[in-house]
Amino acid sequence: TGLIAPDKKTVDYIKRSDGQVPKNWMEFCIDTPNSDATVFEFDASSLSPQIAAPHSPENSENAEEFSNTVFDIAYIGACTGAKYVDLAAAASVLKGRRIASTVSLKVAPASLQDEKKALNDGTLKILQDAGAEFLPNSCGICAGYGKDRLTEGQVCLSSTARNFQGRMGASSSRVYLASPYTLSLIHI
């Protein structure tokens, strides 16, 4: 298990988003790791774009390793991969461009708040102009629910956090994971 202690920046974000901050939040902070803690430090900016192959997030490789993979669906969605910052990252790639005609781009903003912000600043318009189909804010495809769930044999590149077999629909579907930015770059 990996745990990341909340810091002041995290709590400030929660306060700004009308979230409830537990009164005892400081108990979860660590000034110095205790003897049982293992701390890993790395520079994320040194990583090349990554894609995780089915059926585990652990199956991560450099994105270029998947250049011959054909995707049916590009999905920017879920609470983990469709926050405002994610939608804006995808829009920064797709502005003035269209998604490949062979791919269906589906977007389900993480929350109504994220959707409203993206609507107000034109981010959703950029995604729409690029060919996005918008879905409701919900677990939907991510949890394999509803009419948009993956069908037999479909291949999806998704900004969700999990790609276990059958997670997003049919057990024969294959889900690859990528950031919204990487997902957008691959499909233009």
Q: What are these model-predicted stretches?
A:
Residues T1-S101, V107-P136:
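Accessory "access/gating" subregions that flank catalytic or transport cores
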Residues K117-P180:
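Thiamine diphosphate
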Residues L183:
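Iron-sulfur (Fe-S) cluster-binding modules
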Residues I186-I188:
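Conserved small/polar residues in nucleotide/adenosyl-binding loops
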